[in-house]
């Protein structure tokens, strides 16, 4: 007898081996029809998978995240099937699941056009409606290589040939199409009902620029039509909010070919930057951090000691002077260790919190650059905490509370926390890792935070906490990190004198809340669609006169506001007031003040809030109080 334990704890017994589909059928016809895959002892498998031992089983349907991934993976194969039907000379390569969809790379004699995509999507719909069975076959490697070579599929044959000879090869067949895949896949193409092809782009074979250029078709697939419609609406909204467009429209920044991945900040954009930096500087000072500054360029020998030269050199900008090799720093941590090492440290000095708004440079591939979101030159709200093992929990707890408070001030209320745990290849003993991981858990628990654990996702030198913020249109962005480092203090010989006069290595916590300033400002712009809250807006107030006779009064109002610390300017141009109001409204200025003879004579201003909200006429002092409250409350 084989005993199958279901997620609710109930058990079902079968006289012999049984498939996932048969178990689902035994539970009910509805579940059998809905089944897309199974999870046997935590492993995702096809519904045709035979269970020949006692096991735990969950039936995967389109209500599960795993089910949606199976749909997307299967739709990638459906895409390849359709392409081969329409363009038999095209060669298939790889087709993985990505966030919200999938892609498939093809080698073809010409680029696919938008008309091609429409035809391919139509063919996919036809093939799905045929409801052909998707069948898994097991082949040995050499036979599988021969099969794909006979079909003229040189890329697929190359992939299979790189697999060890003793490893079984899984092939999936649907109709006349066969493809290499680990699976699992839906039981039949009829399960694939909601999908859309999005775009085509170029991609190098195996990601190597020295190889052939392929055609990458991107698509999205969902369990329900309303989910896809919501996603497509989100994409439309994201297009409207694109920070690159906003940067141009609002005159905040630009990028140009002579400095790829580097940002030219215009006066208004730099005002926003400064507002964010000064805010963060204040928060760090209040939290007991000391701000430092470390060199941009340091000798190769330091990067060799830290391990960056051996493991990260391809991402570093290097230079040579007077027969010495240097690197422009890609990160601040080695420099901070040098400050820690300058002079003898005592346990009484710990925790030592060193912060730096450090400019870093990384040689990112040109094809990966994307506005402010992916750059080569960037500044981080970087800091490193040097502490004892006993101080890990308290320091992690304090950082977690600070991070959540900062995100709240910037308007991000929905924050998800993920804890990345030890990988198979790692430095340090299991005992040290146990202590480090449990310390981070205790800190999160003490803050009342829920978190998701990611086994095997930690860096080789320590576990990590990630902070993911959700924006106004539902996108998630990973910004903050708290990385425990068990290796760098050893590499760079950092030590302190302990209470018993012995020398010990400090624990090093790498931490950032915003991450890259450039990227965070891009996220802020898109979150607010450019309409930044008053405390961050580059221009908080514009004062406009109706006629020349009010120009002097308008100037005096601006001077008063500037003395109060507000970012205010006057628009005294000889233009119609409606024109000026419209122009500054498009620039998303939080407050527009209009002054005519009546307002001048009464020392008042007519106030319009962003969104064409008429707040009426009020004394200048009343408006000042209103703006002060907005800034103080981060409204």
From Swiss-Prot:
EC category name: ligase
Listed SMART domains: tRNA_SAD (SM00863)
Residue ranges of the region described as Catalytic: 242-533
Oligomer status and interactors: Homodimer.
Single GO MF descriptor: tRNA binding
Pfam family, one: tRNA_SAD
Keyword Transport among UniProt keywords: no
GO biological process terms, semicolon-separated: threonyl-tRNA aminoacylation
Gene responsible for this protein: thrS
Binding site for Zn(2+): 333, 384, 510
PANTHER family attached to this UniProt entry: THREONINE--TRNA LIGASE, CHLOROPLASTIC_MITOCHONDRIAL 2 (PTHR11451:SF44), THREONINE-TRNA LIGASE (PTHR11451)
Catalytic function, reaction form: tRNA(Thr) + L-threonine + ATP = L-threonyl-tRNA(Thr) + AMP + diphosphate + H(+)
Domain called TGS: residue spans: 1-61
Family recorded in the similarity comment: Belongs to the class-II aminoacyl-tRNA synthetase family.
Any one cellular-component term (Gene Ontology): cytosol
PROSITE patterns in alphabetical order: AA_TRNA_LIGASE_II, TGS
Protein's UniProt name: Threonine--tRNA ligase
Alphabetized HAMAP family for the sequence: Thr_tRNA_synth
Entry's EC annotation: 6.1.1.3
């Amino acid at each position: 007898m084989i005993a199958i334990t279901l997620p609710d704890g109930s058990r079902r017994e079968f006289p012999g081996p049984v498939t996932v589909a048969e178990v689902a059928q035994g539970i009910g016809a509805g579940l059998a029809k809905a089944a897309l895959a199974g999870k046997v002892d935590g492993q995702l498998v096809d519904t045709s998978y035979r269970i020949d031992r006692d096991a735990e089983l969950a039936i995967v349907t389109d209500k599960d995240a795993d089910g949606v991934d199976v749909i997307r993976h299967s739709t990638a194969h459906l895409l390849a099937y359709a392409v081969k039907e329409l363009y038999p000379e095209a060669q298939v390569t790889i087709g993985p699941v990505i966030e919200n969809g999938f892609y498939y790379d093809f080698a073809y004699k010409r680029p696919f056009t938008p008309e091609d995509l429409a035809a391919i999507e139509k063919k996919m719909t036809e093939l799905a409606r045929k409801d052909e069975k998707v069948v898994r076959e097991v082949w040995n490697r050499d036979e599988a290589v021969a099969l794909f070579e006979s079909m003229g599929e040189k890329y697929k044959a190359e992939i299979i040939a790189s697999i060890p000879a003793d490893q079984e090869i899984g092939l999936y067949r649907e109709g006349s199409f066969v493809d290499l895949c680990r699976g699992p896949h839906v039981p039949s193409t009829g399960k694939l009902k909601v999908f859309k092809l999005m775009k085509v782009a170029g991609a190098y074979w195996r990601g190597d620029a020295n190889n052939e250029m392929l055609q990458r078709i991107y698509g999205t697939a969902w369990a329900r039509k309303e989910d896809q419609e919501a996603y497509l609406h989100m994409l439309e909204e994201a297009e409207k909010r694109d920070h690159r467009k906003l940067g141009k429209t609002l005159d905040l920044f630009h990028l140009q070919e002579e400095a790829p991945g580097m940002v030219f900040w215009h006066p208004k954009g730099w005002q926003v930057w400064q507002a964010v930096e000064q805010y963060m500087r204040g928060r760090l000072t209040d939290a007991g951090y000391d701000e430092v500054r470390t060199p941009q360029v340091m000798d190769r020998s330091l990067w060799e000691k830290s391990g960056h030269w051996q493991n990260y050199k391809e991402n570093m900008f290097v230079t040579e002077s007077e027969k010495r090799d240097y690197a422009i720093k890609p990160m601040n941590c080695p420099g901070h260790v040098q400050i820690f090492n300058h002079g003898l440290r005592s346990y009484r000095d710990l925790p030592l919190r060193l912060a730096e708004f450090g400019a870093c440079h990384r040689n990112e591939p040109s094809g990966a650059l994307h506005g402010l979101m992916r750059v080569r030159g960037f500044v981080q709200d970087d800091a490193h905490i040097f502490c004892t093992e006993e101080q890990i929990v308290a320091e992690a707890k304090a950082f977690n509370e600070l991070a959540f408070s900062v995100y709240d001030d910037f308007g991000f209320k929905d924050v998800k926390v993920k804890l990345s745990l030890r990988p198979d290849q790692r430095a340090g003993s299991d005992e040290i890792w146990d202590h480090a991981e449990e310390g981070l858990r205790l800190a999160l628990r003490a803050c009342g935070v829920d978190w998701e654990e990611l086994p095997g996702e930690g860096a080789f030198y320590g576990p990590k906490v990630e902070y993911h913020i959700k924006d106004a249109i539902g996108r998630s962005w990973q910004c903050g990190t708290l990385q425990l480092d068990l290796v760098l203090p050893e590499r760079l010989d950092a030590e302190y004198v302990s209470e018993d006069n012995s020398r010990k290595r400090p624990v090093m916590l790498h931490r950032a809340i915003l991450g890259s300033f450039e990227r965070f400002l891009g996220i802020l712009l898109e979150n607010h669609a450019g309409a930044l809250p008053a405390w961050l807006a580059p221009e908080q107030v514009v004062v406009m006169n109706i006629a020349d006779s009010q120009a002097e009064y308008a100037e005096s109002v601006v001077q008063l506001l500037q003395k109060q610390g507000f970012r205010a300017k006057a628009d005294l141009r000889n233009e119609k007031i409606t024109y000026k109001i419209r122009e500054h409204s498009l620039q998303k200025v939080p407050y527009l003040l209009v002054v005519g003879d009546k307002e001048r004579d009464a020392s008042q201003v007519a106030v319009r809030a962003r969104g064409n909200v008429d707040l009426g006429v009020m004394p200048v002092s009343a408006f000042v109080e209103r703006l002060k409250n907005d800034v103080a409350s981060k409204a």
